């Protein structure tokens, strides 16, 4: 089981450099969906963070076996202590059941330096499977947290495509 996950954002060159300089770690490079150029690098080695972003999270709940492939949904919440207990209880109930069709992993993360900041990270076979779940009553337990009061925001990612190699002119 993964106990810690760290993440950072940056340009392709910067993130590739981090990966190259830390070959002893396991990373996942993600690209934002919808045509955005945003890149995110996950350190899934479980080791202390090497990033300066301070986006370091404790894995509170893990359901499924992450293979770190597919479609990634990040839902961010800032919860007070009481809401956090209720949220974790509801997620534990959900985690006691089989994952929804197409979901391979559900992770609940809380920030190491500010435990009121949560991420619900779900990994899917496809964006279609995610959208079906998102519109179903199985997502209902999360809708009450998906408000501006909880500083809610969401982002979706997929594995970043391999870096294009420069084409060499053939003379």
Give the residues covered by each predicted segment.
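Short S/T/G/P-rich N-terminal loop/turn motif that feeds into the first structured element of a domain
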Residues: 1-102, 107-115, 129-135, 152-171
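Cys/His-rich zinc-coordinating modules
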Residues: 120
